[in-house]
UniProtKB/Swiss-Prot annotation:
Keywords from the named record: Cytoplasm, Methylation, Protein biosynthesis
Organism, scientific name: Novosphingobium aromaticivorans (strain ATCC 700278 / DSM 12444 / CCUG 56034 / CIP 105152 / NBRC 16084 / F199)
Protein's name according to its UniProt entry: Peptide chain release factor 1
Record's subcellular location: Cytoplasm
PTM annotation: Methylated by PrmC. Methylation increases the termination efficiency of RF1.
Entry-linked Pfam families: PCRF, RF-1
Family: Belongs to the prokaryotic/mitochondrial release factor family.
GO CC term (a single one): cytoplasm
InterPro entries tied to this protein: PCRF, Pep_chain_release_fac_I, Pep_chain_release_fac_I_sf, Prokaryotic/Mito_RF, RF-1
Function in brief: Peptide chain release factor 1 directs the termination of translation in response to the peptide chain termination codons UAG and UAA.
Length: 354
C-alpha cells in the first residue's frame, strides 16, 4: 500500500495543527483531552510519514544533481535510499492501518481449566503465571479478581485485570484453547497426557460505556468457601450477581469485604457485557474479521505446549519455537505475540491492497 505525497502532506499539516493547538494553552477540559488523544494517535504515523517524505525528497534532489564531481557520491546515496525506502513505506502503511478502538484499553484475563481434570487446572495456573511474568516485563499491573483453586495449587478458573499501555493490543490474540502435552505430577506410570485450558482476553470498558440498571440485577450474598469446600471466613461476604436481561452470572468471594467483592463482580459483569456487544458488532463485520489471525473464536485450538520435546507451536501461523521453558517464564512469549501481531498486520495490508 503506497501512500501518495499529497497524503503525506495532509498528515504533516494535521499533526502541526494539533501541536499548535496543544501548545497554545487555550484548550480546556474535553477539548484538551480530545486533542491530546488525537495527537497521541497521530504521532507515530506522522513521524514515519515525515521520514518517508524526506527520503522521497532526497531521491528527487539526488537524481536531478548534474555536477559530475558529485555524481558518484550521489549514485551511492541514491542506492542507499532506494534500498531503505520500501521498509520505511511498509512501516508507514502499518502505522496507518485502522486501529481496533479497544487496543489501548486494559483487559480482563480469564483462564479456565478444560479437559484433563487436576492436570488441566495445574496447566491453567502455569498459563496465568506466564502472563503475570510477561505483564511485569511490559510494565503492566495485574490484579487478581477471583480464583477457584484446587488442592494441588491448580486453578479451575482465574480472572484478573491487566492494566497498562497497549494491553489489549498485545494480549487479544491469546484468546482460545491452549493445549499441553506432558507427564502429569499425578501420573505414576510416566505416560504423557494431553490437557487443555481456555483463555479469554476481554477489553475492559469505562463505566460510561456500559450502563447497568439496578432493576436488571439479582444479587445474592453467601458464605465464601475455599478449595475442597472448607469455609475461609465466617461472614456472608461472597457475592453472586445475575444480569437478568442477558442471563450472565458473575461470582466473587476472594475479598473479605462484601462491598469489595460486589465491586469486583460488577467490574467483571461490565466487561463481559461490553464483550458481548463487541462480538455482536463484529459479527456484522464478518468479512473484516476474516483478515484477522485465527477466527477469534475462543473454542479454537490455538497453541500446543509439548513438554517432552520442549516446543511450543502456534497453529494459526504455523510457528514452532523450541524454547518452552523461556516462553512459560515470560520472556519467550514476546516473540510469539510479536509474530502474531506482524501476521495480523500483513493480512490486513493484503486485504486493503486487494
Amino acid at each position: 500500500m503506497s501512500v501518495s505525497d499529497a497524503r503525506l502532506a495532509q498528515i504533516a499539516a494535521r499533526f502541526a495543527e494539533l501541536e499548535a493547538r496543544l501548545a497554545s494553552g487555550t484548550l480546556e477540559g474535553a477539548d484538551f483531552i480530545a486533542a491530546s488523544r488525537d495527537y497521541a494517535e497521530l504521532e507515530p504515523v506522522a513521524r514515519v510519514a515525515e521520514e518517508v517524505r524526506e527520503m522521497r525528497g532526497e531521491l528527487v534532489s539526488l537524481a536531478a544533481l548534474d555536477d559530475p564531481d558529485m555524481r558518484e557520491l550521489a549514485d551511492e546515496e541514491l542506492a542507499r535510499i532506494r534500498a531503505e525506502l520500501p521498509e520505511a513505506e511498509h512501516r508507514l502503511a502499518v502505522a496507518m492501518l485502522p486501529r481496533d478502538s479497544a487496543d489501548a484499553r486494559p483487559a480482563m484475563l480469564e483462564i479456565r481449566a478444560g479437559t484433563g481434570g487436576d492436570e488441566a487446572a495445574l496447566f491453567a495456573a502455569d498459563l496465568f503465571r506466564m502472563y503475570e511474568r510477561y505483564a511485569a516485563e511490559q510494565g503492566w499491573r495485574v490484579e487478581t479478581i477471583s480464583v477457584n483453586a484446587n488442592d494441588l495449587g491448580g486453578y479451575k478458573e482465574v480472572v484478573a485485570n491487566v492494566a497498562g499501555q497497549g494491553v489489549f493490543a498485545k494480549l487479544k490474540f491469546e484468546s482460545g484453547v491452549h493445549r499441553v502435552q506432558r507427564v502429569p505430577v499425578t501420573e505414576s506410570g510416566g505416560r504423557i497426557h494431553t490437557s487443555a485450558a481456555t483463555v479469554a482476553v476481554l477489553p475492559e470498558p469505562d463505566e460510561v460505556d456500559v450502563a447497568i440498571e439496578d432493576k436488571d440485577l439479582k444479587i445474592d450474598i453467601y458464605r465464601a468457601s475455599g478449595a475442597g469446600g472448607q469455609h475461609v471466613n465466617t461472614t456472608d461476604s461472597a457475592v453472586r450477581i445475575t444480569h437478568l436481561p442477558s442471563g450472565l452470572v458473575v461470582t466473587c468471594q476472594d475479598e473479605r469485604s462484601q462491598h469489595k467483592n460486589k465491586a469486583k463482580a460488577m467490574q467483571v459483569l461490565r466487561t463481559r457485557l461490553y464483550d458481548m456487544r463487541r462480538e455482536a458488532a463484529q459479527g456484522a463485520e464478518a468479512e473484516a474479521r476474516k483478515a484477522m489471525v485465527g477466527s477469534g473464536d475462543r473454542s479454537e485450538r490455538i497453541r500446543t505446549y509439548n513438554f517432552p520435546q520442549g516446543r511450543v507451536t502456534d497453529h494459526r501461523i504455523n510457528l514452532t519455537l523450541h524454547r518452552l521453558p523461556e516462553i512459560l517464564e515470560g520472556p519467550g512469549l514476546a516473540e510469539l505475540i510479536d509474530a502474531l501481531i506482524a501476521e495480523d498486520q500483513s493480512k490486513r495490508l493484503a486485504a486493503m491492497d486487494g
